[in-house]
């Protein structure tokens, strides 16, 4: 049974009903409707921490979705799951793919910066100050672009940048 038919709480049920109505009335192909259904089920599974199920749904959505903009969000969400699982290298691959399709995705830029910042912190712990500087520089570049696209969204990043560049 699809996840969308297993929702237990009122908000999820309401969202599912509204989404189903929209999918039925919007002039889209069956393929696009299927892609959206998989994407929606992936988001629901991801929200519940069911990452394996979410990935299965996202990969099915990717198989069906042809619009680059819509694909960017699927790829971004796959990156989020890999980030949550500590697989930062794989997460970066998906964030980069998302940005190739949608360069105006500040949340992907932010998450890339967070990973580089984390790696910079790890390099400091290992006594690799030169490597940490390179990683922090990369983080700064990605945060600057994220902030340029969404100036009010990344206040912690702005604070870090102010300290890092001064």
Swiss-Prot record:
Location(s) in or outside the cell: Plastid, Chloroplast thylakoid membrane
TPR repeats: 35-68, 72-105, 120-153
UniProt gene name: ycf3-A
PROSITE patterns in alphabetical order: TPR (PS50005), TPR_REGION (PS50293)
Record bears the keyword Mitochondrion: no
Biological role stated in the UniProt entry: Essential for the assembly of the photosystem I (PSI) complex. May act as a chaperone-like factor to guide the assembly of the PSI subunits.
Keyword annotations: Chloroplast, Membrane, Photosynthesis, Plastid, Repeat, Thylakoid, TPR repeat
One Gene Ontology cellular component annotation held by this UniProt entry: chloroplast thylakoid membrane
A GO BP entry: photosynthesis
Family: Belongs to the Ycf3 family.
Species, as recorded: Oltmannsiellopsis viridis (Marine flagellate)
Protein name per Swiss-Prot or TrEMBL: Photosystem I assembly protein Ycf3
């Amino acid at each position: 049974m699809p996840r969308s038919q297993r929702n237990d709480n009122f908000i999820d049920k309401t969202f599912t009903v509204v989404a189903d109505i929209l999918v039925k009335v919007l002039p889209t192909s069956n393929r696009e409707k299927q892609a959206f259904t998989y994407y929606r089920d992936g988001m629901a599974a991801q929200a519940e921490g069911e990452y394996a199920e979410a990935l299965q749904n996202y990969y099915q959505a990717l198989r069906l979705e042809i619009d680059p903009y819509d694909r960017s969000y699927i790829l971004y969400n796959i990156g989020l799951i890999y980030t949550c699982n500590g697989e930062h290298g794989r997460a970066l691959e998906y964030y980069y793919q998302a940005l190739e399709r949608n360069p105006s995705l500040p949340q992907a830029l932010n998450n890339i910066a967070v990973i580089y910042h984390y790696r910079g912190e790890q390099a400091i712990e290992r006594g690799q100050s030169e490597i940490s500087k390179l990683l922090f520089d990369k983080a700064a570049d990605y945060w600057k672009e994220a902030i340029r696209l969404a100036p009010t969204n990344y206040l912690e990043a702005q604070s870090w940048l102010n300290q890092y560049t001064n």
